[in-house]
């Protein structure tokens, strides 16, 4: 943005987890060679001199874990607690309004904004208000990536092969094995999942039948 100390992407890398890994530790490791201020106190206030409040009273650094704005500091998400796992995706971004990154405390919308697949044609066309779909994939397809995006990223989204109750959960970076007749279930804002928001519009479940 105009007047910013810098813009663009500083790092896009994989980090090898250990039993001692934390979300914050992964961020610091990924930004090795850059100047990160505040990580030791569990709040990043500056990266390479791009500081909190440089872009206004609401501006600063925020982070998502699997495209979800976490409800605690990054240091609270750890391998030891089972809240940081192989395949998880961490993004640290600079915001001016919070809502410019897709999160909001001002609404309780638990629909999906988008739902994409690495292959195949979805029918009908995706809408956050449509909850059942057919995904037609090319013959011989044995796996695919599912990338859901919440309308409000303060709510978690998870994907399952099968149902939420009996299926297996897959991370957003993991290929889901499929065959003709497979069912993929994408859930947003289960009541038992953490969120910074005090209320929600209730759990939303999207069912995708693979053919």
Where are these regions (language model features)?
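Hydrophobic, secondary-structure "cap" segments at the distal end of domains
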Residues: 19-82
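Short, surface-exposed secondary-structure boundary micro-motifs
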Residues: 94-95
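Residue-level "contact hotspot" at macromolecular interaction interfaces
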Residues: 83-84, 177
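Loop/turn positions that initiate beta-strands
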Residues: 87-90
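Beta-rich interaction/scaffold domains
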Residues: 98-211
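Eukaryote-biased recognition of intrinsically disordered, low-complexity regulatory segments
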Residues: 1-14
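Short, surface-exposed loop motifs enriched in S/T, G, D/E and P with embedded aromatic residues
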Residues: 13-17, 122-125
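Short, solvent-exposed loop/turn positions at domain surfaces
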Residues: 11, 77-78, 172
